[in-house]
Curated annotation (Swiss-Prot):
The keyword RNA-binding does not apply. The gene is MNT3. Belongs to the glycosyltransferase 15 family. Keywords: Glycoprotein, Glycosyltransferase, Membrane, Signal-anchor, Transferase, Transmembrane, Transmembrane helix. InterPro entries: Glyco_trans_15 (IPR002685), Nucleotide-diphossugar_trans (IPR029044). GO terms for molecular function: alpha-1,2-mannosyltransferase activity; mannosylphosphate transferase activity. It is an enzyme of class 2 (transferase). This is Probable mannosyltransferase MNT3.
Length: 378
């Protein structure tokens, strides 16, 4: 009887004080990061403590207080591997020196596997302030969709060995991800604009204005630096399917001439998407989603080698207007093997550029920029 009374008393105490007890235990527990967890730190010792407390298998951010917050809701976006860490560090330092030390924008890093301790620690250490997002790509966004015959796709890849990344499985996953899923990632969709960067790229000029603020003030939705022709072998059926989609949906666009030649057929031109500064709304809408689903169901990402650059470019030509597009001509941008270097000597000196203007790709026979500008400005 006595024990019965004791149990009743304990039950009453637990019901009465359970919120306080739960709070007490929480104060002694290191929680695994949730989808929105953001760790704040001010010293490297605190950063190490944060990293050593968890395996970080999901999406989270690390934040060091910034004196001057960014003016717009934008992020620098990079898809990379743990093994890329040293080229990532070089690129970040370059971007900080040339641009972001002045504007303090967030970085968002995405990977198809969890970022490891070394990557997170080194990257967080080199960025002096602001928020750094580390995200894991959902497996369904980095794998074969159910309608793809994997054996057939594997066999077909061998026929593409003579074109860049032609026999790569991961490259195809990447192109599909950047075509239809990156803007849906929970760490990306919180922003309005993104600037896509890649490991190893270089910025050769000081950027003395806020590129995101410029895009917003001037109502620009898509910005590019370099354009070029796609390898026709990688997209043999893409344009036929696009024409079918245009006809089926009765699409009229003033930008279609960007992608057609004098014979009114596909000219293979595209914006080089390893650099793009864009409004995420150009992808987060029914028009783009329907277009992507149409292409994805055709299987061309795996049965051919459709790239995200032609997909983005075709969508821009279908759904945007001339006034929405901006060419960043004075960035001084390099991604192997092409360079965009300012030709105006006064701007070159003013922005402390260090690239060789004679190696500029913009006006070469392999560039589409002259054609693009003629369409955009007429």
């Amino acid at each position: 009887m006595l024990w019965h009374l004791v149990f009743i008393l304990i039950a009453i105490l637990l019901l009465t004080f359970s919120p306080k007890i739960e709070s007490l235990f929480k104060s002694f527990t290191i929680n695994k990061p949730t989808k929105t967890t953001c760790y704040q730190y001010t010293t490297r010792e605190q950063l190490k403590s944060i990293l050593e407390s968890d395996t970080h298998e999901t999406n989270f951010c690390i934040e060091k207080p910034s004196i001057s917050p960014p003016k717009t809701n934008s992020t620098l976006l990079m898809l990379c591997r743990n093994s890329d860490v040293f080229s990532v560090l070089e690129t970040i330092q370059n971007i900080q020196d040339r641009f972001n030390d002045k504007y303090n924008y967030d970085y968002t890093f995405l990977n198809d596997v969890p970022f490891n301790y070394e990557f997170i620690y080194l990257v967080s250490s080199i960025i002096p302030h602001g928020k750094i997002n580390f995200g894991l790509i959902p497996i369904e966004h980095w794998s074969y969709p159910s309608h793809i015959n994997i054996s057939l796709a594997t066999e077909i890849r061998q026929n593409y060995a003579n074109v860049p990344y032609g026999d790569s499985e991961s490259y195809r996953h990447m192109c599909r991800f950047y075509s239809g899923f990156f803007y849906k990632h929970e760490l990306v969709k919180q922003y309005q604009y993104y600037w896509r960067i890649e490991p190893g790229i270089k910025i050769y000029c000081d950027i003395d204005y806020d590129v995101f603020e410029y895009m917003i003030i001037n109502d620009k939705k898509y910005g590019f630096v370099i354009s070029l022709f796609e390898y026709s072998e990688t997209i043999p059926t893409l344009w036929n399917h696009v024409v079918q989609y245009i006809n089926d949906n009765e699409i009229k666009s003033e930008l279609l001439p960007l992608l057609t030649n004098k014979y009114n057929w596909y000219n293979l031109c595209h914006f080089w998407s390893n650099f793009e500064i864009a409004n995420l709304d150009i992808f987060n809408n029914d028009d783009y989603e329907n277009f992507f689903q149409y292409l994805d169901n055709l299987g061309g990402f795996y049965y051919e080698r459709w790239g995200d650059a032609p997909i983005h470019s075709i969508a821009i030509a279908l759904f945007l207007q001339k006034k929405d597009i901006h060419w960043f001509e004075n960035i001084g941008y390099y991604h192997v093997p092409y360079l965009q270097c300012p030709q105006d000597i006064d701007l070159y000196v003013k922005n402390k550029c260090t690239c060789n203007p004679d190696e500029d790709f913009t006006w070469s026979d392999l560039s589409c920029t002259n054609h693009f500008l003629n369409i955009l400005h007429n």
